[in-house]
Amino acid sequence: MAVGRPKRVMIVAGEASGDIYGAGLVRAVQAADPAFSFFGIGGPRMREAGCETLVDSADMAVVGLVEVLKHFDVIAAAFLKLKKILLEDPPDLLILIDYPGFNLRLGKVAKKAGVKVLYYISPQIWAWRQGRVKKIKRLVDHMAVILPFEVPFYEQAGVPVSFVGHPMADLVEVSLTRDQAATSFGLDTSRQIVGLFPGSRRSEVSRLLPTILEAARLLQQCLPGLQFVLPLASTLSDDDLAPWLEGCELPITVTRDRIHDLMRACDAVISVSGTVTLEIALVGTPLVIIYKLSPLTFQLAKRLVKVEHIGLCNIVAGETVARELIQEEASPEQIAGEIGRLLRDAEYNTAFRERLTHVRERLGGGGADRRMAGLVLSMVEQS
């Protein structure tokens, strides 16, 4: 393909983490070749990077069968919008970021339209629904994975695959000390700080924030001097938290800025499962991982999931770095008990922090955005 010719790339990131990774990729590609333009599904970070978002990822970020059914109309409309573009005005490349239920269907449309498909960040099919690898082999031209053990999985299935490294290895770099970070948020460095991380999806917040807040109340009863911080994800608004925070008497600082500095300011964190657990681990802050699904979704998942851990920091480390409390175990009492131990048991805390160092060791070096940009340029040039 001639150098300098405008090159259009459709990119689909249906969740907050994908918005972060997509933004880094867009910047890296445009730095290498300004002739590239991006459009598709994303959030504020991708828009800031220069991507035209036809659909906001905040409207797509749901988990579980019941939750998807509730948002079916929005998701279906987004799919039809992108399908129409793929068939009537096909781009030079389609980049899919995780979000497999939606993205694999879109990949099928791209194949019909003759558009090459680059899949960035593998669905966790090694954990469940391994049969999906056959569909991926049919629909995806190249798989770019971020965890080393994913490479042999795809190689054995005959899927072209590259290990590009985990983008978080570059994104999570904090130079501040705990006290410096705490001071920057106006917090009292002499008092312990607990992070309350309810997730980036509205459905997660409504399902888990009440439990997290009740755990915080129990902690405050035992440790009256505690301070709490709560990050507001880019996919959420103040209104999404209002039903639970209005009238809440806990000393909670809500912020949208400098998430990694906020993690460093914390002495311990209550976090939902997801990419955020990896970020917290890379910062080096002890945490407890919680998750709840609707009863129907959980029963289905229990039959299908084939891995020991749900927390990404534990999956990457290959061991139980952070305790996981799932469904009924994710009670305010158990959550408060684990955080209380992290705050009061110095020996337990030290051993925990030592395990956290294993996570960064397993991720290896950075450079994921640069490697991904190289793949994008190569695939477009060959198309």
Swiss-Prot record:
The keyword Ribonucleoprotein does not apply. It catalyses: a lipid X + a UDP-2-N,3-O-bis[(3R)-3-hydroxyacyl]-alpha-D-glucosamine = a lipid A disaccharide + UDP + H(+). GO terms for cellular component: membrane. It comes from the Bacteria. GO terms for biological process: lipid A biosynthetic process. One of its GO terms (molecular function) is lipid-A-disaccharide synthase activity. InterPro entries: Glyco_trans_19 (IPR003835). Gene3D superfamilies: Glycogen Phosphorylase B (3.40.50.2000). It is an enzyme of class 2 (transferase). The keyword Transferase applies. Pathway: Bacterial outer membrane biogenesis; LPS lipid A biosynthesis. It holds the Pfam family LpxB. Its EC number is 2.4.1.182. Keywords: Glycosyltransferase, Lipid A biosynthesis, Lipid biosynthesis, Lipid metabolism, Transferase. Condensation of UDP-2,3-diacylglucosamine and 2,3-diacylglucosamine-1-phosphate to form lipid A disaccharide, a precursor of lipid A, a phosphorylated glycolipid that anchors the lipopolysaccharide to the outer membrane of the cell. Belongs to the LpxB family. PANTHER family: LIPID-A-DISACCHARIDE SYNTHASE (PTHR30372), LIPID-A-DISACCHARIDE SYNTHASE, MITOCHONDRIAL-RELATED (PTHR30372:SF4). This is Lipid-A-disaccharide synthase. It comes from Trichlorobacter lovleyi (strain ATCC BAA-1151 / DSM 17278 / SZ) (Geobacter lovleyi).
